[in-house]
Regions:
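Structured binding elements
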Residues: 138-143
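Interfacial helix-loop-helix hairpins and adjacent transmembrane helices
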Residues: 104, 134-137, 163-193
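Solvent-exposed alpha-helix faces
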Residues: 14, 111-112
Length: 193
């Protein structure tokens, strides 16, 4: 009875989180007028999950239903951090900065807000994680997921996301060069007949 209800709740939560990620992706795709930038923003979400699992291992807690809810909250914070960074990169590019320069400047400009968001979240949740009362015991797995997930995903936001942005831009430029070569070659071939 209780185990089956717990499994059903877990499955429903995972499905709803997947649906939420798709909706977030769609909204960001419209806002950024891009299909790949929302993917970059969402890349840190799995790292938040990894951080949550590491946090549970470090503190000796088992992953529970409340842990999954903490991962969901963590995903929101992580998406916001990445959104702030990618938006700044795009604005700098619109102002005419070269890609690498825009990546460095955006990292510098958004370093403090991203770090402060993560650290204040982590430090603010420390009292709950160290609470020993019976009432707090059910919250500790959720708080552990949120705090360690945000802390771990912050490094990903500041290092991996700009690197992936650069790689994606390079791949896009490479694809355009191939397309131009193909069209030029096709044009030469059609001139032979």
């Amino acid at each position: 009875g209780e185990l089956q209800e717990e499994m059903e709740f877990r499955d429903a939560t995972v499905r709803l989180m997947g649906l939420a990620m798709m909706i977030i992706y769609a909204l960001m795709a419209v806002a950024f007028r891009s299909y790949w930038q929302p993917l970059l923003i969402l890349t840190a979400v799995p790292f938040g999950l990894m951080g949550a699992i590491f946090g549970h291992m470090i503190l000796g807690w088992q992953v529970s239903l409340f842990s999954i809810l903490g991962v969901t909250a963590c995903a929101g914070v992580v998406v916001n951090d990445n959104l702030v960074l990618i938006d700044r990169i795009n604005r700098l590019r619109e102002e005419g900065q070269e890609l690498f320069s825009a990546l460095l400047q955006a990292g510098e400009d958004r370093f403090r807000p991203i770090i402060l968001t993560s650290l204040t979240t982590f430090v603010g949740l420390l009292p709950i994680m160290s609470e020993t009362s019976v009432q707090a015991q059910f919250l500790i797995p959720m708080v552990t997921s949120l705090s360690f997930g945000v802390l771990f995903a912050t490094g990903v936001t500041l290092i991996l996301v700009p690197a992936l942005f650069l790689i994606a831009e390079d791949l896009g430029a490479f694809r355009l060069r191939l397309l131009h070569r193909y069209r030029a070659h096709r044009g030469e071939a059609s001139g032979l007949y």
